[in-house]
Amino acid sequence: MTQEPQPKFINRKIDKKGLGKLISWAFSHYGTARTALLADNLKNLGFRFATRGAVSISVEDLQVPDSKVNILETAEREIQRAEERFTRGEITEVERFQKVIDTWAGATQELTEGVKENFQERNPLNSVGMMAFSGARGNLSQVRQLVGMRGLMANPQGEIIDLPIKANFREGLNVTEYIISSYGARKGLVDTALRTADSGYLTRRLVDVSQDVIVREEDCTTQRGIFLGSLRDGDKMIVSLEERLVGRVAGRDVVHPVTGEVLAPRNTQFDYDSAARIARSGVDAVMVRSPLTCEANRSVCRMCYGWSLAHSHLVDIGEAVGIIAAQSIGEPGTQLTMRTFHTGGVFTGEVAKPLKAPFDGKIKFSSALKARPMRTRHGDDAYQADQAGTMSLEGSDGKKETVTITPGSLLLVRDGQRIEAGTMYAELALVGKTARKSTEKAQKEVFSDLAGEIKFADLVPEVKTDRQGNETQYASRLGLLWVLSGEVYNLPPGAETSLERGGKVEQGGVIAETRLVTEHGGGVRLKEQDAKGGREVEIITASVMLDKAIVHEEKSQGREHYSLETDNGQVFALKVSPGTKVNNGQVVAERVDDRYMTKSGGLIKYSEGVEVAKARGKQGYEVLKGGTLLWIPEETHEVNKDISLLEVEDGQYVEAGVQVVKDIYCLTSGVVAIAQRNDILREVVIKPGELHLLDAPSDLKVAHESFAYPGTEVIPGVVTTDLRYVEQVETPEGLAVLLRPVEEFPVPDEPDAPSQEASQQAGSSIRLRGMQRIPYRDGDRVKAIDGIELLKTQLVLEITDQAAQLAADIEFVPDEKDPSMVRLQLVILETLLIRRDVAADLLHGSTLTHILVKDGERIGPGAIIARTEILAKQAGTVRGISRVGQTVRRILLVTQSDLVNVPVEGTLTVKPGDLLRAGDKLAKDFASPESGQVVLAESGRVVVRIGRPYLVSGGAILLVVDGDLIQRGDNLALLVFERAKTGDIIQGLPRVEELLEGRKPKEMCVLVERPGKVQITQMPDESYQVSVVEDDGGVTNYPIIGQSLVVVDGQQVQTGESITDGPSNPHDILRIFTAREGLQKGIESVQRYLVNEVQQVYRSQGVEIHDKHIEIIVRQMTSKVRVEDGGDTTFLPGELVELRQIEQVNEAMAVTGGAPADCTPVLLGITKASLNTDSFISAASFQETTRVLTEAAIEGKSDWLRGLKENVIIGRLIPAGTGFNAYEEAEEVIEDDELIDDTLGLRTVGVAFAGDDDFVEEEDED
């Protein structure tokens, strides 16, 4: 404890920050008990006065600053000006948008200042003000929304909506504002939900990787350490040296840079005072001890860790610093933003510092200042400084102010210009490694506000062809694209026009007409108009009717079934229903016929003379020539059960009704054949027939599996009486012959087809053809128990000739003589739709249709059915006809409403064809009221055709060509622009995760491998070739793909510096520095990079985390190396080993003269590191349990129970805090022979542990 200081008397207004400082001061000087008392007293004081003060919020407390009206008016004037410049074509769409966003951002900022001033100056005791400024509730940005304005919001895609919410919650929002406002609110909610999940998982991984880091030693006596300086981003201080030193231990003596006096000897602990003293002395960097360089075994020592931040003293032995580190990094995770808003334009506060004139005066540039003209992002003309120099502002009364201009700064004034106070005259570009502007390419569409014709004024289109051969038009430089107003008619496909350019059209006159033409011709059927006023015309190309057959309808199970009865009594089942379409070759009906039904499954054989062809679409075989089908019945049971359930033997003769397999009975008598595989019974076949035993195989006089005709002697004494199929079988009684019965089914050559009459249009014919199909081929075995149908007779639609691709419609037609009888008719229709007449709308004129045919008329192919005319909405002159190939697609009429008549006196300064902007002079005192093109200029009047100029920036993609006709809202061009990315694209949690998981960043920068001088060559296709001429004369080329450079030609670069923008890849840093400066340096540089990067993310969100927490995690990530070559050691190539372990083994090798192991450092992400820890219990409880345990079992691993997690899992006391000593004592009790030495000299405790519980009890007794 420091000597007791004098109590301080603090008498001032105190806010949240001040309160924190007060408590912290009390704590470090007076300890816990007295601080607690102080806090208690403060609480009572606070409550007492809060109760008396009765601070509450009423609507009256929400005071809107008076300056709001003026601020909004100014902003709206600026925006109005930008809109006017945009309409005149002086700035592009992007520049307008940027200007709007920046103006509103500025206004919001100014208003926030106004709110602050209003509360602090005019009304310091306002409840809302007191709450916000004291830090009790709310903050300035929330108060701004209550009494200032809500400001700009982003849409769900993250683009800023250029309509700000001007109202605040005190005034209330209107409907539009309310909806825009809800966008942002919803995003906030969704983000928070995602954040908590992400951050929880991050914490879990961190705890797992660091849970075994415990302070186990007093001092590891290492001479190494890390250099701490202040962490800055450009000119902005992120963490000061003083802040970083507190709670650290000096790694070597700290010496005053001027006097040489030792400010702090080695191993000094820095407290607030000594840290402040060192920072004041001007020391740039101090070497401190750090967990990163601690040489304690698998832990850290007290000196390297430094203070335990909980009580500002050196950390105690046995403290679980790993878990503390993990929680310190994980907990603020929720406060980090998930993703950056992708904000179209980013406020430039980040990358440029605006300079405003403090007084009126005249600008002077120094001679060194070199600047070139350029266009700002608001479309103003300005200069950009190429070389540094100074610029001074000289006031009339001798005042003078000089500023240093950095390269890349914007100068908004000219040399010698006079400016007024408050004018912004420059934007200084910040210099510094981290202040680099990273930009990305983005596109913005330009839509036309009016319909009309495109005219390129000074645009020079340039065509680029990519590798696929697609051509794209680009604007080669800044230029104007005009849209000259007119009425554009979109013509439907196939429309023809007789108009020519310059032709006149009256209102209601015909612009174009389309014709409806029949392709095949035939009989006409006119349908009634439908609800929408359209009509269908059907043309019957061909039809066929079954004139003698009657259609019967039956209903079953709620569905209709149709059958067809012919005059000779055959019945066909219809396979189609009325109103459906049938294609060529499709089956229309199938005969209902049981002559070809079998009683069971069996074998099918074709007799001589049957000829078949494969039918369409896997539908069996079509009979070409008739004959007889031979059918050998057999009964097949598919079983698929265990063989033990079989009740009969292979080859046994069974009677009908016998159980062959459990619960399966045969329906016929016959010989059993069994198919089995792997003791699974597949099927049981029963083959009926006469069974005769054979004495010798030679007795069989007929070939096996052939037919025996009636009267054939099969074996001596057996003669067949009818046709049989002969099979030789093995029975339990011996060899036998089975004579199987054969059924014969005759097949006619041609099936009966019902009579039909057809009406055909020349060239296409249609009929129904009878067809016989056999589903099986010769020799097929049909597995079935019930019967099957061997032959199907079908009616098939046949369409011949050119109409084969058409489909026929099914119709049921009442008979002419007897309407109660219904006949089947198939027709081929050509259906033509006649559109209803439409009134004119924005894109089309009105249409009028005439039908030119009558119902029932017969017409030839190519006849015109109807004609549709497109009529003009207004009278006008044809000015443009846009064609695609030969067909006209759009027609432009210029009507009276597109022209402006301007009476003018005096001499005209314009001639026909000139393009004017609104406000340009027509004659001396006469300005044009509209932008456009002069059509007529005669004495006394000028006629201007209204137009609208659009400024297109160089490099923009043009989507129209000169002379195109476009409708309103068509896309004219894509402006390509670069927008600044705020800091880094990935911010917040995802970035922390990316760093800690050691992932390669998406758009990573290119790093310099060896120091040297940069040479940049520009290629013809605008890309760069960067090479570094190294100090030893070697040259390395670096490929740059689509990234912007951050170095300039001739710049000297060091190892590991970045050439392009974007985040670095930590693996590259490790590789480059290891190759250049050795293992230790490589590991150190990547450790430094990771610690600083993680700190930057947290600091940018205003979260303070001490470096040492991040260092512990990074230490765990970099503690392993990969063995490349094991040398004479026991290590295997590719193995991941602790660096310490390899160093110790290599020291031993140096003594014995063996070859040392060779290794490269690896950076493991936290997940990988957790899974690679020595403790398999810890790794298995984290992820991939099965894999970890299986591998541990195969390798025969032991778990040394060093960490907390392993011990918790198996239910022992954890080796931290008071449990730490139990270990030390436990190890002393054990006899030497029970110790097993491990390579690291860490002792494992065998099972003969002197009972953990005893120690706990002994301690209790003390």
From Swiss-Prot:
Keywords: DNA-directed RNA polymerase, Metal-binding, Nucleotidyltransferase, Transcription, Transferase, Zinc. GO terms for biological process: DNA-templated transcription. The keyword Metal-binding applies. SUPFAM superfamilies: beta and beta-prime subunits of DNA dependent RNA-polymerase. It holds the Pfam family RNA_pol_Rpb1_5. Zn(2+) binds at C220, C294, C301, C304. Binds 1 Zn(2+) ion per subunit. GO terms for cellular component: DNA-directed RNA polymerase complex. HAMAP family: RNApol_bact_RpoC2 (MF_01324). This is DNA-directed RNA polymerase subunit beta'. It comes from Gloeobacter violaceus (strain ATCC 29082 / PCC 7421). The gene is rpoC2.
